[in-house]
């Protein structure tokens, strides 16, 4: 991987799924490089369900559980210094709930959490998922990124 000067800040404040910080940084850097995104900083927070639901309530006045919250900060192409792409707040436990009995397969579990990170990065880049067409377009980009990351052995891991 070519050296890029993007500060990827990862915080793991949950105990449901072990997350390797370096693995998460690698995933983010590969995606941003693949998409030719130029930014100075991006923040990814792995939270427990309670913390994410509380944030969901604070930001969107909706206390329900969710898998990820993305807060884009600086749009790609803007010239702020430093350029901060955004913040993503992700619940690894949501992947366990989604996969149900298949969550015992750690490869599937980490692939699903990787999808959440990719999904959040796409939101930071301006992709939306409010309509069926937008969801389809986003899912295609997510799947392309997952394929690229699989080839490079850069999916999240424990």
Swiss-Prot record:
GO term, biological process aspect, one: rRNA processing
Localisation per UniProt entry: Cytoplasm
Superkingdom: Bacteria
Species of origin: Chlamydia caviae (strain ATCC VR-813 / DSM 19441 / 03DC25 / GPIC) (Chlamydophila caviae)
UniProt cross-references to Pfam families, sorted A to Z: YbeY (PF02130)
Cofactor stoichiometry and binding remark: Binds 1 zinc ion.
Keywords assigned by UniProt, alphabetized: Cytoplasm, Endonuclease, Hydrolase, Metal-binding, Nuclease, Ribosome biogenesis, rRNA processing, Zinc
Functional description taken from the UniProt entry: Single strand-specific metallo-endoribonuclease involved in late-stage 70S ribosome quality control and in maturation of the 3' terminus of the 16S rRNA.
A GO term from the CC aspect: cytoplasm
Protein name according to UniProt: Endoribonuclease YbeY
Residues annotated to bind Zn(2+): 119, 123, 129
Main location: cytoplasm
Gene3D superfamilies in the cross-refs: Metalloproteases ('zincins'), catalytic domain
């Amino acid at each position: 991987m070519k050296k890029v000067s993007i500060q990827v800040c990862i915080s793991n404040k949950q105990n449901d799924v072990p997350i390797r910080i370096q693995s998460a940084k690698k995933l983010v850097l590969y995606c941003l490089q693949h998409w030719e995104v130029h930014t100075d900083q991006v923040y990814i927070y792995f939270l427990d369900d309670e913390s994410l639901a509380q944030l969901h309530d604070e930001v969107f006045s909706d206390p329900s559980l969710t898998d990820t919250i993305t807060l884009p900060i600086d749009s790609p192409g803007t010239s702020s210094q430093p350029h901060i792409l955004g913040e993503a707040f992700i619940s690894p436990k949501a992947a366990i709930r989604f996969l149900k009995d298949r969550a015992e397969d750690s490869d599937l579990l980490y692939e699903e959490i990787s999808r959440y990170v990719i999904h959040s990065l796409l939101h930071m880049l301006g992709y939306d998922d409010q309509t069926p067409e937008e969801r389809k377009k986003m899912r295609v980009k997510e799947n392309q990124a997952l394929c690229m990351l699989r080839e490079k052995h850069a999916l999240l891991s424990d």
